[in-house]
Curated annotation (Swiss-Prot):
Its EC number is 1.1.1.361. InterPro entries: Gfo/Idh/MocA-like_OxRdtase_C (IPR004104), Gfo/Idh/MocA-like_OxRdtase_N (IPR000683), Gfo/Idh/MocA_oxidoreduct (IPR051317), NAD(P)-bd_dom_sf (IPR036291). It holds the Pfam family GFO_IDH_MocA. It is an enzyme of class 1 (oxidoreductase). It comes from Bacillus subtilis (strain 168). This is Glucose-6-phosphate 3-dehydrogenase. The gene is ntdC.
Length: 350
């Protein structure tokens, strides 16, 4: 697969196009966006053709990157799959479990490579951690804390589709940022959450933009336990102060602890009692854009290389639409567990 088209011309599409430009034998055919002016601006920067019709872009491409708004993912992915094209769909997979199920079932019937945009699987420090877990260097794992804090809800004053109800909460901090963390926990441990153990909190702190009500969360906390007995804490935020922003992972094993924070991006810490060792993180190739964390741009490049390779070699593993469906299930369970909508009753103690 060489000829790749992109549906959508927003920020994530630009990250894909930047990464694609560094990959040998990969060609950006062009882009389709509902806003033709955005598409024209996109191709001036990245090359290719601005398509006025999504079907024409699909016909001209061997593989499609679906980087449109969440509520368009199902439509655009099915259009591409219907023409037997390879697909890489941005996260979250869809805006409902029903949509995700249709997408998964369609992909499974066809001889194409349908991948999810879970690019955090390709972060170097995540894969270092995975190797440490697999090789039992941390010992039996007790807990993982993974926090992703941004300030986009404070910076972005314009009301957009991310703030309204069309995406059914999937464009809030938990759906937008947390879906990566849900998949990452699965990628590291391959163990499901115990539903009864999960507690969730979702808040909307920036309540209006341009005098319109914001209908999604900008802060969420999740607590729960996996079936393999690992305790999990997930925090996502789009309303953090700059000094608190960043991406962090802490894993406690009975032998050692692993700690990483993008505030100190070039090292991760291995802690054994009082002994703390700073270990190097590989140097990144691409420059990360403002307000994104270390390794973010490289993760798109690795994701695309892997997806392209998978179209030529079946043994190459990719985050599949089945993985996307699983993460969508967990996300919807978290929504249902939100304490704002599901008050817990506390029995009196005599």
């Amino acid at each position: 697969m060489k000829k790749i088209g992109i549906i959508g011309a927003g920020g994530i599409a630009r990250a894909h196009a930047t990464a694609l430009s560094t990959i040998k034998n990969a060609e950006l055919v062009g882009v389709y966006d509902i806003n033709q002016q955005n598409a024209e601006s996109f191709v001036k920067t990245f090359g290719g053709k601005s398509f006025e019709n999504v079907d024409e872009l699909i016909d001209a491409s061997e593989g499609l990157i679906v980087a449109s708004p969440n509520f368009c993912h199902k439509e655009h992915a099915l259009q591409a799959l219907g023409k037997h094209k390879h697909v890489l769909c941005e996260k979250p997979m869809a805006i409902s479990l029903e949509e995700a199920s249709i997408m998964k079932d369609t992909a499974e019937r066809l001889s194409v490579r349908a991948s999810m945009g879970f690019n955090y699987r390709y972060l170097s420090y995540v894969n270092i951690l995975k190797s440490l877990i697999i090789n039992n260097e941390l010992g039996n794992i007790l807990s993982i804390k993974v926090h992703f804090k941004k300030n986009s809800a404070l910076r972005r004053k314009k009301f957009t589709w991310r703030d309204d109800a069309n995406s059914k909460k999937t464009s809030g901090s938990l759906g937008d940022l947390g879906i990566h963390l849900i998949d990452m926990v699965w990628y590291l441990f391959e163990s499901d959450f115990i539903t009864e153990s999960v507690r969730a909190k979702m808040n909307t702190n920036v309540k209006t933009k341009e005098d319109k009500q914001v209908l999604v969360d900008d802060y969420a906390e999740i607590y729960g336990q996996l079936k393999n007995k690992v305790f999990v804490n997930i925090i996502t935020s789009k309303c953090s102060v700059p000094e608190d922003c960043g991406f962090s992972i802490e894993v406690v094993g009975h032998k050692k602890e692993f700690k990483y924070h993008t505030g100190n991006p070039h090292v991760y810490k291995l802690i054994d009692g009082l002994n703390v060792v700073d270990c190097p993180v590989p140097q990144s190739l691409l420059n990360d854009p403002p307000n994104e964390f270390y390794g973010w741009a490289d993760s798109f490049r690795s994701e695309l290389i892997n997806w392209i390779a998978s179209t030529q070699n079946d043994w190459v593993e990719i985050p599949s639409f089945s993985d996307g469906f699983r993460s969508q299930e967990v996300l919807e369970m978290f929504f249902e567990k939100d304490s704002n909508s599901q008050p817990m009753s506390v029995s009196a103690v005599n």
